[in-house]
């Protein structure tokens, strides 16, 4: 689902409702102090649950003293973020 690669956390599982809980938990477990970049370049499918997962990682980053950024967000997820008015909450790498 998520693996460390080249200093980033590469998300490889589809960002869909069926995987949301597993991705949320895997991302939380991977958080560490400092900058953490979630890279979505290997994601080939995503739905609205992706926004919830990303916001969950941002919330979990605070107690972990991590600074989360997102790279290669799928176009559909970006569109949903704009629709929901949360684009400014998703820091880009």
What are these regions (language model features)?
Residues 1-49, 56-93:
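STAS-like cytosolic regulatory interaction modules
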């Amino acid at each position: 689902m998520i693996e460390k690669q080249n200093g980033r956390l590469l998300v490889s599982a589809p960002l869909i409702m069926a995987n949301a809980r597993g991705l949320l938990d895997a991302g939380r477990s991977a958080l560490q102090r400092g900058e953490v970049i979630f890279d979505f370049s290997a994601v080939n499918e995503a739905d609205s649950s992706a926004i919830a997962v990303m916001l969950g990682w941002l919330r979990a980053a605070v107690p972990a003293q991590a600074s989360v950024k997102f790279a290669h967000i799928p176009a559909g997820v970006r569109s949903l973020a704009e629709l929901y008015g949360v684009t400014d909450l998703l820091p880009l790498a």
